Amino acid sequence: PIPRTLAITLHGDMDLCIIDEMPMNRKPITTKVVGEERLTRVYDFIKKEVQSGKQCMIVYPLIEETEKSDLIAAKEMYNDLSAKQFSNLNVGLIHGKMSKIDKDQIMYDFSNNKIGVLISTTVIEVGIDVPNSTIMLIEHAERFGLTQLHQLRGRVGRGSDKSYCILVRRNFSENSKKRLQIM
C-alpha cells in the first residue's frame, strides 16, 4: 500500500481489504532500472513493440526545459523523438497546461490506438486505463517518489499482454540506485 493509505488504515479510519491475487489474465509487470547509456536499446525495444500493435507511455518530470534545471522536458523530447527515433510511429503529447478538450482528444486517440507512443508528464498518473499500453518509460525516475512511480507503473499491465516499466536514472548516486531498485 502507499504510505498515506497505510497510515489511514493503521489509525482506524479505513477498513483493510487484502487483494492477494492479480485480476484474471494479467501478468506481473517487469520493472527495469537503466542508465541513460542504454536508451538507444530501449527506444529500439519500444519501436518493435509499437510496430507490433502495442502502445507506450513516456513520462518526463517537466513540461518545458528551464535554465535552472538539468531535467529533460516533455515538449522538447516530443519534438526530438517524433522527428528521430519514432519518426515512423504516431506520437502524441499530453501535459497539464493543455486545455481539457485537447487532453481529452489525445487520450481518446491513445485509447483507440491512433497514438502508439504518448509523451507525457505525470498528468497520466491516475485515471488512465488502456489495456493495450504495455510499456511505461519514466525519465529521471530518481526525481519521483516511490508512490508516484508505483502509480505510473500501474498505468500498464492492465491487459493480458506482458508489460514493462523502465526507469531511466540520470543521477548515479548509490542512494538513488537503491531507492529505484525497491520498485
Predicted feature locations:
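Inter-lobe coupling/hinge segments of SF2-like helicase ATPases
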Residues: 1-182
